[in-house]
Amino acid sequence: MFALTFLNPNPRLPSPLFLAKSTPESALSRRSRAFSSSNSYPWRPNLRFNGFKLKSATVPENVEGGDLESGSLVKGLKLGGMFGVWYLLNIYYNIFNKQVLRVYPYPATVTAFQLGCGTLMIAIMWLLKLHPRPKFSPSQFTVIVQLAVAHTLGNLLTNVSLGRVNVSFTHTIKAMEPFFTVLLSVLLLGEWPSLWIVCSLLPIVAGVSLASFTEASFNWIGFCSAMASNVTNQSRNVLSKKFMVGKDALDNINLFSIITIISFILLVPLAILIDGFKVTPSHLQVATSQGLSVKEFCIMSLLAGVCLHSYQQVSYMILEMVSPVTHSVGNCVKRVVVITSSILFFKTPVSPLNSIGTATALAGVYLYSRAKRVQVKPNPKMS
């Protein structure tokens, strides 16, 4: 028995020696069994096949891992560069725009000019085929017009606020955007927030309230305009989310481009109605008599328009590369960068309580972003 076990390592399979001695069979049957794939030692072909499978799965895996690692590094560097450009364009836009509004207090005209710069840049983009032209149906156009109205009012009200109060204060108030995002998502989409999201809104509201009470440049027009811009901008974002669900939805860049063009068309007659026709040599002369030459005024106005469209375009490009939650965190950091740079450039006086209020509001925005990340994180499931 021991000898049989030694000769046959697998006791379940009959030993070849045992078969040879105990089973009488003809030479023809032995020959046919030798050439039969089903009867001849079934473990050997499987071992060879498994070894082949192991090699073919191992070698490309190492090569592919290196490609993925280098690809992720390139993508990370590209994304980091785009975030840097986004922040830099925001800083320059707020600096140029504030200097223009200081000497030329016509926010509707300024906003229309800036949207006109964006419209020209979009036309160049489509003519040079840098991005495919959009195709949309009449039913989609109706929804896009609604988005354009919200976009127009958001930009106009932001410029009204920037013309009345400090840049840092306007952006502190605009840190309230998550509050209105949650509110409008409940009203328009029926999406109820989690407890963590509601808790993260408390420091935002408290911080903005403290910063408002201690703001040296506070006035009600500037405050209410910034707050109203939060409502219109977040209405646009929530409606965009609803619009982008369909299979025939436009991509982010084309959607933003069409919204910009329609906003420009809507705002030109509105600017004439609100401000009057203020693009005359006499009005420009009055504006330049307050510290800027005609050349400086024109260059700053043009650069503000280019920076506005460029940073919004880059923002949409980043949104296509990352999740909305990551984009929200980046937007929070952007506010910190813009507020800090504007305080340093314009030498804005800031009290300790004002600083605490601003920091509290921005910390709340960051907590909101983290709470959103927890909410959207899927539960792992075994497949």
UniProtKB/Swiss-Prot annotation:
Domain EamA, chain residue ranges per copy: 93-212
One GO BP annotation here? Answer: phosphoenolpyruvate transport
Record GO cellular component, one term: chloroplast membrane
Q: Which residues span the membrane?
A: 76-96, 108-128, 143-163, 179-199, 210-232, 253-273, 299-319, 350-369
Q: How the protein sits in the membrane?
A: Multi-pass membrane protein
| Function comment | Phosphoenolpyruvate/phosphate translocator that transports phosphoenolpyruvate (PEP), 2-phosphoglycerate and 3-phosphoglycerate.
Q: Provide the protein name.
A: Phosphoenolpyruvate/phosphate translocator 2, chloroplastic
Alphabetic keyword roster:
Chloroplast, Membrane, Plastid, Pyruvate, Sugar transport, Transit peptide, Transmembrane, Transmembrane helix, Transport
Gene that specifies this protein: PPT2
Provide the disulphide bond pattern. Answer: none
Q: So which tissues is this one expressed in?
A: Widely expressed in leaves throughout development. In flowers, expressed in sepals and pistils.
Q: From which residue to which does the transit peptide run? A: 1-55
